[in-house]
Every structure is written in C-alpha cells, then in structure tokens.
C-alpha cells in the first residue's frame, strides 16, 4: 500500500506526453488523498518542447479534492486512477515530456 510522502507519477499521452506528479498526503485502507506537485524541468531541447522533468519538492503542492481508490495490477503493481490515467510509484528518475 502507498504511504504518506510517496510520490506518484502519471502522464497524459496521445501524440504528446505530459507527465504529472502527486504526493500522498493521507492513506485509508483502500484509498489515498494526494496533492499535485509542480514540475521542475531538468533538461530540454532548447525550445521547451522535449525534455525531462522531476517533481518540484521545494514548493508545497495543491490538494486534489477527493480520494482515489488504490488497485493492484499484475503488469505494473499498485496504482490509482487520477484524471483517467494510471498513477504509479515514481522511481526517482526524470520523466520524459514531448510534443508533436
């Protein structure tokens, strides 16, 4: 089960990829509450269209209203759906973003 302080990542993706990060702020037996964190660009192509981001842990996040049910998948383990995307535990490496 996720724990308070865990960082999760999810991305909107079709012809572009826009990663997002959230931090777990409350845990119940079957759900979590999260706050949305700002992205911090760590590298880009010079135009800001392609690159890598990490969560900005220096600024406080913004609480997302409601709770999210935690589920289990044999493919990628524990997750919850946020804004229609699968949020999973962030592995600590920068996430790629790009636009077409």
Q: At which residue positions do the language-model features occur?
A:
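Mixed-charge, low-complexity intrinsically disordered regions
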Residues: 1-21, 31-100
